[in-house]
């Protein structure tokens, strides 16, 4: 289960005293807690991970990102994790800060998750279990528009994302084969640098995930791959995440969700 640090005291209390103990009954392998750009939630993220572990025996997997993070901040975050008894880190580049479209490294900071994994292994050896992100459909930044009449390979056809343009017409996007191969090669570099497992971006097409796993294994990536599954709570949230992640939704599933868009209870149960 993945959690975002709440923005209010009431939200924090509800998470610690209601949601975490309720979720703990499901006996998850771990819970992970996100990390705000520039360490904006660092203290709260650390405290929530500590409480999840101490109060409910949950294995905490703490996000750590490169966004607006000087090396000194990353060092402080890792030291805080060790002090709190947290031994699991999700090493990520991170998304651009709110209001910005393009990701940029801070001066003297890391440029990617590979840099972060390499740094953690160099400074902390095998103390931390490191997770990294994997993208079965390709990272959103390399999922590109398909030109009208452009031919796609069989592999690309299975990854193609259907959406609508500003005029309501059909729009096709895909991570082309060359970019997809680069994605797999980069993922292997992260694993070779010391990542212990891969957590995937959310997906709705199981065949896309299975092909991703096959491609990883063929590339020599042998670490466990944990599927990332989005729990749909609202139609608006579902559509927002589709746009943000550029996720493929099989037509049958898309039609079923569309039919439930005004039925909150039915959508949650779905």
Predicted regions and their residues:
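Active-site pocket-lining/capping segments in soluble small-molecule metabolic enzymes
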Residues: 10, 108-178, 183-184, 214, ...
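A generic, well-ordered mixed alpha/beta core segment in the N-terminal half of proteins
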Residues: 64-66, 70-97
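Hydrophobic faces of well-ordered beta-strands that scaffold small-molecule active sites
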Residues: 1-6, 29-33, 60-64, 89-91, ...
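Catalytic beta/alpha-barrel core
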Residues: 30-41, 64-65, 89-92, 177-179, ...
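Active-site-adjacent beta->alpha loops and helix N-cap segments on the catalytic face
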Residues: 10-14, 39-51, 70-76, 96-123, ...
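N-terminal beta1-alpha1-beta2 module of alpha/beta enzyme domains
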Residues: 1-36
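Active-site cofactor/substrate anionic-group-binding motifs, chiefly glycine-
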Residues: 25-67
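Acidic (Asp/Glu)-rich catalytic clusters
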Residues: 20-27, 46-57, 78-86, 121-125, ...
């Amino acid at each position: 289960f993945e959690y975002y640090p709440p923005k209010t005291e009431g939200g924090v209390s509800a998470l610690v005293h209601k949601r975490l103990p309720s979720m703990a009954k499901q006996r998850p392998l771990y819970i992970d807690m996100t990390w705000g750009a520039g360490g904006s939630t660092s203290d709260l993220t650390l405290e929530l991970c500590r409480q999840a572990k101490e109060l409910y025996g949950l294995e905490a997997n703490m996000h750590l990102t490169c966004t607006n993070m000087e090396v000194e901040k990353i060092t402080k975050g890792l030291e805080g994790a060790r002090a709190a008894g947290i031994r699991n880190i999700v090493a990520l580049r991170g998304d651009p800060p709110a209001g910005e479209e393009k990701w940029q490294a801070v001066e003297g900071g890391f440029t990617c998750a590979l840099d972060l994994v390499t740094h953690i292994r160099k400074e902390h050896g095998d103390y931390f279990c490191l997770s990294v992100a994997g993208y079965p459909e390709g990272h959103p930044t390399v999922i590109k528009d398909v030109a009208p009449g452009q031919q796609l390979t069989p592999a690309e056809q299975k990854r193609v994302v259907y959406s609508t343009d500003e005029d309501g017409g059909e729009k096709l996007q895909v991570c082309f084969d060359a970019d997809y191969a680069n994605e797999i090669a980069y993922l292997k570099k992260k694993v070779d640098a010391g990542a212990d497992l891969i957590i995937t971006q959310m997906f709705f097409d199981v065949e896309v995930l299975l092909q991703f796993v096959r491609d990883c294994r063929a590339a020599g990536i042998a670490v466990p791959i944990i599927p990332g599954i989005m729990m749909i709570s609202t139609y608006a949230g579902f559509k927002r995440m589709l746009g943000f992640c550029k996720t493929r939704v099989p037509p049958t599933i898309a039609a079923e969700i569309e039919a439930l868009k005004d039925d909150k209870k039915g959508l949650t149960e779905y």
